[in-house]
Amino acid sequence: MSGKKKIAYPIELPFTIQEPILLNNAIDKYQLHKELIDQLLNALKGSFHVGYVRRQKKYIHGISANSLNEARREKLKGIPGIEGETNVVFGTFLPPVKGKGEFDFSIYNKETNFYKLWDYCYGENAIRDGDLIVDKYIKDNKLRQKWDKFCVKQKNDEHKMDMNSAHNTFNILGEIQFGNWAMVYKDMFRLVSAINKNAQIDLYIYIAATDNLKKIISDGVVGVNAARERFQENIDNHNINKPVMIVPLDIDFDLDTYDFSEAEKGYDEISREIQELEQKISWNKKKITVLNDKKKNADSEKAKIIKEEIKDLRNEKKHNQQELDELKNLYKISDEIEEI
């Protein structure tokens, strides 16, 4: 859900994480795969470029939730073996064919993943038209090359046997959620759906905001405490039977003493430039409308003069619009999350 449009002025802020919340035997997974999980957790710490926004609230300083989400995703890309947007298709993990994925990131055993898709499309009890399934869901060129190379080795076993995949795999699905509080229900639904598709999910990681971080994003975003309560409810009623780690993302500075003066100055300057350009464009439109009306009743000589004036105004309007679009793109106009 979105509210008033805001510009997001780029600044760098320090972030950290609080102690992760481990649900449904997630502690066992953490102890077994501590090195990998710590690598992921450590990637969430440090200074990140985010978008500063001004808000009409008690605490006027804020940051764009979208910019924070993008910064986290970009940092996670540096972890070996991690995948970005991920869908669960017939129990396998695949990148979305188009648009956003069901999950923000994943780490999974690539060979075992191919085994599962092979069994579904070409195994002993495979679905009919397995080739069509593959063509529909494996669109990424690099992934298709790996799949085709894998299939060459298995071609003689089509519809004769299922593949014996490794049992010592460790698969992670994860979500970074700084959206409206109601998104936690959608996220849980996606997890339950993936479980029902027989995906091998060894750990689900959910990154949400602490109360401190919510103060500079919005009180309406998914918070750690609410996420913990909702996930625990669904674990208790057996909708979710996978280990869940909730990671509290926090700011690493004192809100009451942090100096935002440079960010405020830059934000005000850009806001003023955008407002001035919008006013010029609005004035151009009104002036063009007035001149068009005048031209209708003018004699031919006067009409030519008016036509040239309109042409100049349109060129000026076009130039101003281009400049405005460039500014908005550079400073990433973002949606501010509405308070609930």
What is each PLM-predicted segment?
Residues 1-97, 268, 272-340:
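Nuclease-adjacent, charged terminal/linker segments that flank catalytic cores
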Residues 156-245:
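Conserved binding-pocket/active-site segment within a compact domain
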Residues 108-141, 255-291:
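Internal, charge-rich low-complexity segments
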Residues 64, 101, 223-224:
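A diffuse structural propensity rather than consistent per-protein peaks
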Residues 58-60, 75-168, 180-189, 196:
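Active-site metal-binding core of divalent-cation-utilizing nuclease and nuclease-like domains
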